[in-house]
């Protein structure tokens, strides 16, 4: 089962940047969060983890 990982970073004036990636497991998603470095001038704000939809979920 794949997961969509979305990480949000925010800077001092409130501009938000979004980083999207996929992970094969929840453990891989945690690894993505640990390795993530926010762009210069930004800091980590929050993340979202959701199941990736497949053709089998739609049927």
From Swiss-Prot:
It comes from the Viruses. It comes from Bacillus phage PZA (Bacteriophage PZA). This is Early protein GP1A. Keywords: Early protein.
């Amino acid at each position: 089962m794949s997961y969509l990982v979305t990480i949000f970073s925010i800077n001092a004036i409130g501009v938000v940047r979004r980083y999207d990636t996929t992970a094969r497991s929840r453990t891989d998603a945690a690894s993505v969060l640990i390795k993530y470095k926010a762009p210069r001038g930004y800091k980590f704000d929050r993340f979202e983890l959701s199941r990736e939809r497949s053709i089998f979920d739609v049927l």
